[in-house]
Amino acid sequence: YDFIICRNRDYLNWRYFRHPFYKYKVIVALKNERILGYIVFREEKEAKTGYILDILGDLNYPHHIYFLVVKALRYFKKKEVENVCCSLTHKKYISVFRKIGFYPYEKTDCLIRFKDTQLQNVFFRRKNWHLTLGDGDFQGMK
């Protein structure tokens, strides 16, 4: 990806495992001790809502992504979660989520002006991006 937040150990620990307000669940897909992908999620019990905050895997093997999402959905089902939200930018991720039953809910318009047309060409290709709910601070504070 041309646009992705560095998802190394330090960042993931800071973002999810040392969060002062929320407890996150993580599932990792491994093969021979090699990480093939991961998913980060949490539930909001009062709202009976689940959030998939981060998912990353090799897009050449979408079945790993599928497996991770299905495992998270099984967890949510056990917790009687009624709605699951996520935000994705890449078509291959969106395709996997749609196969599982997710659908687009809301679109927003964003207006941007570029001085550098080279940057504009890269910026508007969604395949260049990997953004998820976990990349923002939408959740606020408890």
Give short role names for the model-derived ranges.
Residues 1-53:
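Amide-forming acyltransferase catalytic core, primarily the GNAT-like/NAT-type
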Residues 15, 31, 42-63, 67-142:
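Active-site/acyl-donor-binding loops of N-acyltransferases
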